[in-house]
């Protein structure tokens, strides 16, 4: 009898230790989920568990949707395009806005003159305002792009806004206020702002788009059928010859306006046609999801995984997706046509967190901006600190140089 009790006790003890071991292994990585058995990783510690869907391919662009069963509530945050359109935010050149004290009197420290790399942002809304590096705003003396991910708190006084110019040559008054262009600078330009934070390199990247002509040859259309998904239309987007593209670039000289180049009828039609093909495949790939939502993407050009944008919620992703997609398309059009394709394993490897040089900037009680660089990889996280800590945006890029 005692022997049986002893055996039962030992068996129960062993079971308890096994269960404890399983729980400890499960909790070692706070992002572990059922998808981990499929090899999916996580964008950043503390983010919801997620997995990658099969790749969506068109021409030399491959997109891997990132889906999650956990979807944060981000409805308490406003985005730049919406805030500018509704008047909840105003962006002007320095010197165009009179700063006032709390009692309404003019502030003697009012901003002096216009500056290339700094504007003034006034937030009047009742929600914190989210800004992402690379968002294009048009107006003032030159079109600009936002220089860094950040959050503007409710009730903030007029703030200096770090930006980069994407319209070299013009320095004359346009609209007094800036408007959201509903555009995101494509990765080659966005990287120079978000990671390198260099005006000279941003300008060089914008000017370098003349080289897109070498990748907009009619020969690209011949390869579309080889890379199109089964059952999908194989037609290629309208393309421009080298001379046609050079003509478009020349027509907007000397301002070298990023916005004008990519809104021109000929270049713009190529971008839109390309984007429609990708979006059709994307919608078909993600339409049957059950209990999961798309929160981000991993992007490859040819066989090289080069970029990823992920968000805390499907709501934020859906807001940014249209202009993100077109930015990836512009990048694909500027890159050499390739028959190589990145694999799902390549995308998973790319999402391995960078563990090299680390730096952090924090506005207490508002947000934390973190950057990690390792080799050619750079990873940036924007975390809201109120009303509770939440990583709103996660970016990883394979730097060009």
Model-derived segments and their meaning:
Residues 7-129, 134-401:
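Intrinsically disordered, low-complexity segments enriched in small/polar residues
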Residues 1-6:
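N-terminal secretory signal peptides that target proteins for export/translocation
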